[in-house]
Each structure stands twice: as structure tokens, then as C-alpha cells.
């Protein structure tokens, strides 16, 4: 049975063959189009089973006529164009402060030469001007972005996460080719408990540098905090593949594996320990579905001292760890 797609192809072929008779100058080009359509759709315009009741041009004219008269279904979309001043102010916000006066002088020269006389082309001219200016100042722009990255690192270390985020945002605005900027912003998003955004930035970092191990391990940490242990282990394994001697990466992988095991198996009752509430029968799998608990457990398990206690089987010291007691103490109050 002939398909509508084949019938449409034949209608187009018939239209092109009529056009060849009316436009001898382009007949050769139209013939090439006819042959291509025949081959692609595997049809023959002489096949009676593929013919429709009216030629394509008539169907088209009827459709256009009906839509032009049916004003009740016509939707008009209006787009408000920005003025030259609005476009310039928007562009100024994307220029490093240190270079802003220089850019404004550049704009003034262009204005004097009449570059913005045509309102319809203002946006195109301004965008091209910005691109040309930033390219001419590439070295300075990269230096400014690097300075912002360093400021962001300092803010992150001080626990000023929103200020750090602002620094990394600007660094990326000025130089979006640097994988480190995205990876550092990913760390900031994780600190702000926005693990989905952290993963997005890790992926952006990996696009720019597929061999950047730290981007994979930060992505693994974000996945761990979301309880997506399979994805976390995959990310950590990739980081280790890139840096096989990195012990921190290996410890992070081991941590994700432990958390995955805990999530899949309900732990046995915990012994009573002075200072710790009765946790018998506590469902650790359910607990680990809580992002706050996962994040705290992730940090604790990444502590080298905690790892050493677990590896040595020193459960007494482990269970009397002040941080662990605090975590379980808080759980007992919930």
C-alpha cells in the first residue's frame, strides 16, 4: 500500500516536471532534483497508485487562501527590539571592569564614524565590536579571568560560597575555554548543596579537557551526595584511570563503594556506646536517601583517620569518634 510520504514525493516530482516546461533556463537543475527525489523515495511519478486528486500547487494555494481568511486563528508575535543604549549597557556588563573604559572609547570612535546610524544593524555591529575588542585584548582578558579564579578559590576556602560563585561566574564569562574554572565552580555548587549544577559544570570541564581527573572526581562526589553510587563509581574509576597513583581518588572510590553497600543492605543493630543513642534496627539505606546525611557521611568517610580506623577494624575508636557521635546524636533527636 502506497504511503502518504510516497504520494507527496510524487506530487513534488509532478510539480518539478511542470516547472521544467515553464523555466527552460533552469530545466537541467530541476531534472537533477527530479532524479534525486526518485532515488531517495524509490518512486515513479507515472505510478497511478501514487497520484492524488489535485496537483500540489492547487493544494498549496487552497491552504494559503484558507489560512489568510481565517483571522481568528492567526497569532501575531511581536518582538521588542532593544535600543542602542540598552544594547550597549548589556554589552558593557560583559566587559571586564579593567577594560571597560578602553571599550567605551572604542565605541565612541565608531559612533563618530557613523557605525550605529542604521538602527536595524545596531545589534550586529555592537556584537561584532565586542568580539573584535575581546580578541584584541585576549591576553589581558585571560589574566583577568585567572585573577578572578584565584579570588574565587580564596573565597571558597573561607567558606564564602556565594562570593566564590560570583568570581567563577565572571571568570567563565571572560574565558569559557578553561576547564579549571568550571571544575572549581562545580566544587562551589557542591558546597551549596546544588549537586545537579555541580555535575553540569563537571561535564563542561570534561568537554574542555577530557583528561582532567579532578573534574571526574568532583563529579563522583556530587553523584555520591545524590545517592547515585553507580555513576559516582564510574566517575571515580575514570579519574583513577587518568591518575592511577592518586590515593585521594582511590579513597573516594572506596568511600562510594562503602556507601553503596550500606544503601543496598540494612546494617545490623549497633551496640550501645556511651554518648550515642540507641540505634538498633535503624534503616541505614533509608538514612542515606537524605542528602544532608549522605553529605556528612561522605565527608566523614573521606577523612584519612576514619579510613584508617575502618581498615584496621578499630570499631571502638571509630564509634567513639566525636564527629560520628555528633552525627548519630543528631539522628537520635529527629
From Swiss-Prot:
Keywords: Chaperone, Repeat, TPR repeat. InterPro entries: SGT, SGTA_dimer, TPR-like_helical_dom_sf, TPR_rpt. It comes from the Eukaryota. Gene3D superfamilies: Immunoglobulin FC, subunit C, Tetratricopeptide repeat domain. GO terms for biological process: post-translational protein targeting to endoplasmic reticulum membrane. PROSITE patterns: TPR, TPR_REGION. The keyword Chaperone applies. TPR repeats lie at residues 145-178, 180-212, 213-246. One of its GO terms (cellular component) is phagocytic vesicle. One of its GO terms (molecular function) is molecular adaptor activity. May act as a co-chaperone and regulate the ATPase activity of heat shock proteins. PANTHER family: LD24721P. Belongs to the SGT family. This is Small glutamine-rich tetratricopeptide repeat-containing protein. The gene is sgt.
